[in-house]
């Protein structure tokens, strides 16, 4: 039993003890869970329903927020079991010291913030097959017939088994050769735990990628089934397990679309929380270079659209604002966002922001020309050919992007972050609209803003800003190759361009 002094010592600490002293938190304008956090954790440990792999910032505030909303409404009595596959420091430095609680900070465009403690993340486990304690616990969880879903935010790279030459990465090859009991990668760990479930109960389960990539469920399914097939070839698993994983009536891989801008934790937010009396809010940098804090700051708007294929039942996700629909509609929403309503605008601002010396995306919207550029990309050029998914209005979505989301001055999002890996994005973000115009009109000659965005990217690749000063390009796997193509171009000298950007198809 907690005594008076135990609670007083933990006043305004993000901990189970700390949030029991509700008065000070309320005075600071911070909402606390209305449900019994300890009971939810206890019940979830006994009967897990939802496991999540990849427990960083977007998971904590968005997916954790969904589970928190269901608990607040009383339509669920379970939280999420959190599993980290990559950066184990996150468990030791952010989850355990704060009793798995999250300080969720929503940054409103008017400068106000909404602050809420989330108690929906009930347990944090490291996906370490070499740790007997962690591995045993994970096996127990997956052996429970009541487990309904396992979801992922591990980034698109987390699903990749092979390199650009089509050969298995060395760490994946080791996972294939060593079998389920020595799994290390996210895909091998998941496949191994599905094998544990198969051996224990053969119960159905939904395996749901929530990463921001096209056809994410297909990517996840292909990687899991390939890992299982390789294990089968090596004699680690039988044909019956291969059949289990390949049967979507038993193991489904729903597609999804996720959208919520979640920048790295801002020092200004940490300072404001500490000034309000909350202790120990400083961000930390882990050994894997993850920049993370006890709090997560993010924008208010958020979208999660999921294909409704859950063979073992599911939480009532729609009660927390999740769009539950069919695969075709998920694909349409994703294409609407990626090819027209958000990502093409972001990329244009990213490359021009780097060239023009901006450090905040929102500040670019104060520039008349840049604001007009993205309005033309989204409205004048995008809307005539946009894919309409029906469940979300493209016009309302792009209006929110242009008038609320991008101009939000309190979102610490940078052009440099968004410019990362642009070579991997520019084709889908602009190419689909160009193709739509060619299909509609026979050519894309009437487009002005989209070609200007692509030209801006080529100019960005020269690595010289508008003042003639060198700057560092954001990380990009194609950067060196692209710079070679542009190596002869001199800024201000039109004659130095000799057609090096023209693509010649191999004969």
How does the language model describe each region?
Residues 66-107, 230-262, 359-385:
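Catalytic or ion-translocation cores adjacent to nucleophile or general acid/base/metal-coordination motifs
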Residues 78-148, 154-159, 163:
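Glycine-rich nucleotide/cofactor/substrate-binding loop typically near the N-terminus or early
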Residues 11-42:
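N-terminal regions that are enriched for targeting/export leaders
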Residues 221, 229-237, 242-331:
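Primary mode marks residue(s) on the alpha4-beta5-alpha5 output face of response regulator receiver
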Residues 129-133, 138-239:
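Active-site periphery "cap/insert" segments of enzyme catalytic domains
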């Amino acid at each position: 039993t907690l005594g008076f002094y135990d609670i007083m010592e933990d006043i305004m600490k993000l901990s189970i003890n700390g949030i029991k002293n509700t008065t000070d938190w309320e005075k600071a304008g911070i909402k606390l869970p209305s449900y019994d956090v300890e009971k939810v954790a206890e019940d979830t440990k006994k009967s897990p329903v939802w496991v999540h792999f990849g427990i960083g910032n977007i998971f904590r505030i968005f997916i954790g927020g969904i589970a928190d909303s269901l608990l607040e409404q009383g339509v669920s009595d379970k939280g999420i079991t959190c599993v980290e596959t990559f950066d184990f420091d996150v468990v030791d430095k952010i989850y355990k010291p704060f009793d798995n609680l999250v300080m969720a900070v929503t940054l409103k465009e008017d400068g106000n913030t909404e602050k809420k403690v989330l108690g929906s993340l009930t347990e944090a486990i490291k996906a370490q097959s070499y740790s007997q304690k962690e591995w045993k616990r994970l096996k127990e969880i997956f052996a429970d017939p009541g487990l309904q879903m396992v979801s992922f935010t591990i980034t698109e790279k987390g699903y990749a088994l092979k390199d650009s030459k089509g050969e298995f990465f060395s760490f994946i090859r080791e996972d294939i050769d060593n079998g389920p009991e020595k799994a290390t990668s996210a895909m091998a760990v998941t496949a191994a735990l599905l094998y544990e479930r198969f051996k224990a109960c053969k119960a159905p389960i939904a395996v749901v990628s929530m990463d921001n990539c096209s056809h994410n469920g297909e990517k996840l399914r292909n990687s899991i089934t390939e890992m299982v097939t390789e294990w089968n070839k090596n004699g680690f698993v039988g044909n019956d397990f291969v059949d289990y994983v390949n049967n979507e009536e038993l193991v489904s891989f729903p597609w999804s679309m996720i959208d919520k801008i979640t920048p790295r934790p801002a020092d200004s937010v940490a300072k404001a929380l500490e000034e309000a009396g909350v202790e120990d809010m400083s961000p930390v940098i882990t050994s894997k270079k993850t920049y993370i804090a006890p709090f997560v700051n993010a924008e208010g708007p958020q979208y999660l659209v999921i294909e409704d294929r859950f063979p073992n039942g599911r939480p009532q996700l729609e009660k927390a604002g999740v769009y539950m629909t069919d695969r075709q509609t998920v694909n349409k929403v994703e294409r609407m966002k990626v090819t027209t309503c958000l990502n093409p605008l972001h990329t244009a601002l990213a490359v021009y922001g780097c060239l023009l010396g901006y450090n905040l995306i929102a500040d670019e919207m104060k520039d008349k020309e840049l604001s007009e550029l993205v309005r033309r990309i989204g409205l004048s050029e995008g809307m005539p050919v946009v894919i309409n998914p029906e469940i979300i209005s493209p016009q309302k979505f792009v209006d929110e992007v242009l008038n609320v989301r991008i101009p939000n001055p309190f979102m610490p999002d940078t052009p440099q972050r968004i410019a990362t890996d642009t070579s991997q994005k520019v084709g889908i973000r602009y190419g689909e609209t160009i193709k739509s115009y060619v299909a509609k009109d026979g050519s894309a000659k009437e487009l002005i803003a989209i070609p200007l965005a692509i030209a801006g990217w080529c100019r960005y690749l020269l690595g010289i800003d508008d003042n003639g000063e060198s700057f560092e390009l954001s990380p990009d796997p194609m950067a060196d190759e692209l710079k070679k193509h542009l190596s002869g171009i001199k800024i201000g000298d039109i004659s130095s361009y000799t057609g090096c950007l023209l693509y010649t198809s191999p004969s």
